């Protein structure tokens, strides 16, 4: 297949639309089900690069959950804990025996379930039955993987009444070293982003604390690889091999940090027993529970707790999750890693990161205020590496 006709481009009025190879060669993909759209393919090709990079860097299967050409979550295939199984809504499945790939997708989808609603999934490995069963129960636009077991493909083909988008990509495909993009009739050309993120990139530790654990190195690499394929400006919080908060596409660095930090806080607040034990009605769907939890742990909690409102969601009225209770729980969050796609211009980013349990930071460095940023890291005993490499993505 040398080209694939699309229903339309970014929007329904943008016609005609297609994907094709400029050199008239075969496309590196097969569409096994559905009819993917323009944005689906943007998500798929960016996500595929992300998960293959993650697998190469860690040796573990990887998955990502993309929305609007940025990852809402991404993870490598580490086993789930009982608490994570509960907050990712997989505790009713045989989660203790999940394949590593299924664990990776459960983590990627679970990082920010509000943003992942209607995601496009990328998988580093052949999609197995466990992973397909996870995908089947979520609201999702499609998936790309290097292959599918017969059982997994049959499960996915039943989704959306047979219209779920399933793409198989040639895992041996290597793009040309130069890439092109056209904007307003003008063609842009640049070398493809082929930077390899490895331990050597993390070796320039500029803080007093230089104790970088193997787990922290892994999480630093995970954060930087995620940022490599996230719309800039971007900041990513990572813990235990998975994104727990991605702040994408903000013009201000500190707003990236605040956004990612708030998402990381929400991820951790979901694990508090007060949230885990919310008395949901049996008829409330997972998506509705996600929405209710998001409001409950936020500042507008009375939107779900007011009389006449709580009865729609809960069997009994939950207690308010007070600001002091939330702060006390968040103070238990530790050993979080933070990556940034460009330098921190002010130390306010570090102050905000500290509130979300950040101990390890990877950023390019190069700000005129690097000394102030380092000083703030030292105040909190953080470990910070200057990579010397910017990771803008547009």
Where are these regions (language model features)?
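Gly-rich Lys/Arg/Thr-decorated short loops/hinges at beta-loop-alpha junctions or inter-strand turns
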Residues: 23-35, 111-117, 193-210, 287-309, ...
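Conserved helix-loop functional segments at active or binding sites
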Residues: 53, 229, 266-270, 355, ...
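Flexible, glycine/charged-enriched surface loops at secondary-structure junctions
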Residues: 57-65, 166-169, 232-239, 269-280, ...
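Active-site-proximal loop/turn and secondary-structure-junction residues that shape catalytic pockets
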Residues: 70, 127, 239-242, 344, ...
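Glycine- and Gly-Pro-enriched alpha-helical subdomains that act as flexible
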Residues: 72-113, 244-343
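C-terminal binding/interaction regions
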Residues: 119, 123-124, 137-167, 172-174, ...
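Substrate-contacting helices/loops that form the catalytic groove of nucleic-acid
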Residues: 177-212, 270-282, 286-291
């Amino acid at each position: 297949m040398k080209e694939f006709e699309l229903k339309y481009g970014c929007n329904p009025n943008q016609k005609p639309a297609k994907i094709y190879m400029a050199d008239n060669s075969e496309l590196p993909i097969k569409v096994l089900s559905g009819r993917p759209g323009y944005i689906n393919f943007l998500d798929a090709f960016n996500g595929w690069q992300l998960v293959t990079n993650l697998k190469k860097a860690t040796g573990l299967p990887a998955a990502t959950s993309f929305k609007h050409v940025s990852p809402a979550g991404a993870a490598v295939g580490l086993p789930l804990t009982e608490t994570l199984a509960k907050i990712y809504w997989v505790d009713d499945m045989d989660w203790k025996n999940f394949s590593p790939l299924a664990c990776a997708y459960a983590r990627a989808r679970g990082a920010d379930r509000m943003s992942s609603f209607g995601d496009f999934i990328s998988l580093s490995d052949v999609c197995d039955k466990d992973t397909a069963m996870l995908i089947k129960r979520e609201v999702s636009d499609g998936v790309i993987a290097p292959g599918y077991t017969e059982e997994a493909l049959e499960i996915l083909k039943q989704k959306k009444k047979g219209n779920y988008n399933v793409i198989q990509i040639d895992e041996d495909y290597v793009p040309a070293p130069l890439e092109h993009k056209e904007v307003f009739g003008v063609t842009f050309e640049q070398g493809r982003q082929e930077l390899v993120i490895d331990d050597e990139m993390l070796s320039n530790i500029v803080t007093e604390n230089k104790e970088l654990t193997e787990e922290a190195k892994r999480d630093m690499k995970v954060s930087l690889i995620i940022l490599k394929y996230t719309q800039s400006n971007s900041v990513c919080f990572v813990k235990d091999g998975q994104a727990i908060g991605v702040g994408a596409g903000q013009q201000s660095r500190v707003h990236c940090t605040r956004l990612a930090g708030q998402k990381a806080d929400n991820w951790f607040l979901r694990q508090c027993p007060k949230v885990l034990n919310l008395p949901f009605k049996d008829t409330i769907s997972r998506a509705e529970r996600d929405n209710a939890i998001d409001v409950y742990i936020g500042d507008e909690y009375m939107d779900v707790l007011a009389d006449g409102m709580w009865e729609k969601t809960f069997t009994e009225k939950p207690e308010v999750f007070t600001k002091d209770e939330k702060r006390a729980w968040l103070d238990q969050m530790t050993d979080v890693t933070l990556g940034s796609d460009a330098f921190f211009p002010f130390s306010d980013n570090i102050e905000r990161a500290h509130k979300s349990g950040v101990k390890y930071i990877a950023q390019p460095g190069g700000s005129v205020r690097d000394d102030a940023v380092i000083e703030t890291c030292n105040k909190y005993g953080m470990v910070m590496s200057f990579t010397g490499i910017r990771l803008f993505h547009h």
